[in-house]
Every structure is written in C-alpha cells, then in structure tokens.
Amino acid sequence: MDPSLPAIVAEIVVDLPESRALSADGTTTWSRADRPFAALGPDGIEIRLDRDIAAAAARTPDTAQSSRGPEWIRFNPGDLDDHALDRLRAWLELAYRRALD
C-alpha cells in the first residue's frame, strides 16, 4: 500500500460533510446516514459502489473485489500516481453520494 494513502483519503473525506468515521481494530470505516461507504485498513481501502461499477472497477490496476460483497472493491495501490488519485477521488465521492440510496 502506498504510505500516503491514509492521508490522501483523509483529505478527500474531509470534504464530505455528512460522513462519520469509526476506528476499530486497525480499520477506519466511514459512513453516511449509518450506511458504511468506505473502510481503510492495512490492505488498502474498500469502497462501496454500485454492483456494475464495482465489477468494472475491479478490472482496473491495483483493484479487486472485496470480501465485503459484490458492491465493494478493494483498492491497494503501490503508487498513487495521477490516475490512481483520480479513481480514488471519484470512487469515494460516488460511494458517499450513493450511501443515501
């Protein structure tokens, strides 16, 4: 995992006003309206997307299906280049918006 991932995630999530963080057992989980949309742990960040988007996202570099279910991906970049940062921001913002659906 890129060592800057936690700081980058924090920078993105701070702009999501209704998100709440809960840390336990080495994992920080963010939710909106009590619905989790992202979880950051030692193996990267897991993000809840629409099922079809998650399936497509899992085919991108450094991304795989999450054990949390078919709507979740695990993103564990070795290097946060511009493309990885773009995907991370887009996925987190989408997950945040979709948490109310």
Per-region residue spans from a language model:
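Charge-dense, helix-prone N-terminal extensions
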Residues: 1-101
